[in-house]
Amino acid sequence: MTVALDGDTIRRLRLAHQQLVAPTLTDPAAVVSHLVAMQAQEYAMAKWAIGLRLADGGSDEAVESACDAGRILRLHVLRPTWHFVAAEDIRLVLQVTAKRVHQANAFMYRSLDLDTPRLESFTDLVRGLLAHGNHLTRKEIRAALPSGWVGDKGFDMAYLLMYAELQGVVCSGPRRGNQPTYALLDERAACTPELSDDDALAQFVGRYLRTRGPATVPDLTTWSGLTVSQVKRALTLLGDEVTTVESDGRAYLLADGEPAGDLRSFLMPDYDEYGMAYKDRSAIAHPDHDYWTLPWNRAVVVDGVIAGA
């Protein structure tokens, strides 16, 4: 018999699983690793999102230090959008998501005349430019390329660098003032034991459910960019590690994690995972508001409900 949960319990579980209530972690990189990946196109807001989940409140300096040291990396790994990923997890995440992000980028690759030989040629060039800790900004990389190598369509460099990220060649380097730099991934993140594709997929999906659940299959596919078939395969592999619960006529997936905690009220940063991790936000959004727009507009969360902005 499927267990039924009310809305408050859904919110209590999500708040606890996301370390937004009774957080236990004091290391910024551990928070990022706990959540597998955290959306981070707004850099200052993403640092704040980490701080919300630190048991000691953390500090901007502590998060910056973890990023500069390469313990937290910032690159395009889902959908594609900038995300924070812990260095220890980056190869796992890329193994699961890179192919899907390349597929999402295929139209832009074609539009920018970036065929595979050109993309691979750039990746080889940038590997040489960044070798031996030579961290460069995007502008510096562009200037160092052979004359006429990059077109004038505007997005060329963004997609060239994204390709190199997805191939596991480049990642974020330490910031230089307010400017992000690029570095070689192999110089920033130690190699980790290789997993089979099935093991990597099951681990990735299981960690999402333990840190975001209860969540639906559409929540997971929207957040991760994975296909329904991939998610179903992962659920088969996870077996009884995942249970199905019901709330308001919807089926939710739940994995072992922190027990439901208290409700909490807080100011939520733009693009925070409490809003962005779900396609269906009806369980966390006030019924009087458009929950598709609230989660990235510096929302006010009252007792776990996104109540305004």
Feature-to-residue mapping (PLM):
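Short, amphipathic alpha-helical interaction segments positioned at domain boundaries
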Residues: 93-109, 186-207, 211, 264-270, ...
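Loop-centered beta-sheet repeat module
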Residues: 154-231
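Short, cationic-aromatic polyanion-contact patches
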Residues: 84-90, 176-195, 250-260
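Phosphate-backbone binding and catalysis cores of DNA-processing enzymes
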Residues: 1-153, 288, 294
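A short, conserved structural fragment
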Residues: 68-77, 81, 165-175, 239-247, ...
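Non-catalytic regulatory appendages
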Residues: 237-287
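Glycine-rich, small/acidic residue-mixed loop/short-helix segments
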Residues: 289-309
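Short, hydrophobic-biased segments on the C-terminal half of alpha helices
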Residues: 63-64, 158-162, 232-239
